[in-house]
Amino acid sequence: MNGLDKIIARAAEGCVCKESREKLLAIEPQCDPDEVRYALEQTDAINSLLIKNGSPRFGGVEGVSQLAARAVKGGVLSMGELLMVAGALRNFQNLVSWYGSSEHDALPTDDLFYALAPQPGLEQQISSAILAPDAMADTASHTLNELRKKIRATENSIRDRLESMVRNMDTSKYLQESVVSIRNGRYVVPVKSEYRGEVSGIIHDVSSTGATVFVEPQAVVEANARILQYRAQEAQEIERILVAFTGQVAAIEPQFQYSYKAMLEIDVLLAKARLALDMKAFKPTVRTDTSFSLIRARHPLIDAKKCVPVDISLGREYDSLIITGPNTGGKTVTLKTAGLLCAMAQCGFLIPADERSEICVFDEFLVDIGDEQSIEQSLSTFSGHMKKITGILELAMPHTLVLLDELGAGTDPAEGAALAVAIIEELRRRGVLLMATTHYAELKVFALET
């Protein structure tokens, strides 16, 4: 049903993580009553917690499961990847705190939240040591801190010497401008090309015009070399820290994967619950027989202010419901409402209907619904209509909900009515629950007499 796809897509917008969004978009109606009941209870539990506690602090992460798996295989995680791991660990902690922020009895979601292993120590270590995907804090280790102190001290010494040089009247006359810059990781001064021999040092670059050569004065060559040495040692120390953090991630990989999977499930439930709040939806009772009763049901895709609630019952007193009335009278909306709400519930969504509503679990939803405001009474429409009906008859069986809009339309009224009666009788013989709309008076009589 296209309507169900739209509802699922709308709910998926509430997912924080891309992986859980994809998981929700792939959801399909469940056919086991116990699974449907459990899924509804989980969504209802999270819905109640959202009302009590508000939304949890929960940031989007993506592909972190693969990062943990790579750590186990010996790959070294980058700073950005470690920050993603820390973000996931922070999510675990925030979800645990949110779940425990209000007292409640045992809930069907307990196992998901108890599966979360936050590892606050590791999360804090990573977050303190790594400031950004390309920036590690000086305090990440004592060695790194000492190396950076040496780098800064040496750089300051070089700048002081070069700035003194560019201010010196005897030297400045050879310079293109009085600035200190960096070329190839070395501090240099811009010397006029014609005076290159007047400033002793190593040429590292030439301007595009050839008018300027960038010279590393001999006085700072040794200091520049020390900086390069310190930079190499700095890179080695950063790599050592990354290897150490990666090892810690690898050590918790089994718990992390279990927690990550639970987090994605929770994200899906939060998205479902947010949709329920938005729709003012409730948990229906799941019946074990083949009958349902929707009380004050509203079409989930129509503005609640414009939607007229409707009561729909089927399967107890009668197995087929024929809806008649003029165009724009709401017949098609009623069909769609019944089908969508039953399918929503089987996907674990709360439904926009009174909490006294009851649903059953169908194995199939067989639908032929058009737009009652633009039905073309033509041979091509009738042919397409009959092709769909033929397909429905091939699949119809007990525990199936069949929804037919304008049954028999598109042909001679007398023939259409007779055909519609024959189709209804065959579907009833197959043991389906059937809802159909019609304009034919003959079907009204048939419904009353059957």
Could you describe each region identified by the protein language model?
Residues 145-195:
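Extended, Lys/Arg-enriched charged tracts that mediate electrostatic binding to polyanionic substrates
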Residues 279-280, 287-450:
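ATPase nucleotide-binding head domains, primarily ABC-like/P-loop NTPase cores
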Residues 1-143, 147, 252-255, 259-273:
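Conserved amphipathic alpha-helical "coupling/scaffold" segments
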Residues 231-265:
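Non-transmembrane, heptad-repeat alpha-helical coiled-coil rod segments
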Residues 166-183, 273-296:
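Long, charged, glycine-rich C-terminal linkers/tails
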Residues 212-213, 218:
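Divalent-cation-assisted or electrostatically stabilized phosphate/pyrophosphate-binding catalytic cores
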Residues 7, 185, 189-205, 213, ...:
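Gly/Lys-enriched N-terminal cap/neck module of very large, oligomeric protein machines
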Residues 118-134, 222-243:
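Extended, charged coiled-coil "arm/hinge" scaffolds of SMC/Rad50-like chromosome-maintenance ATPases
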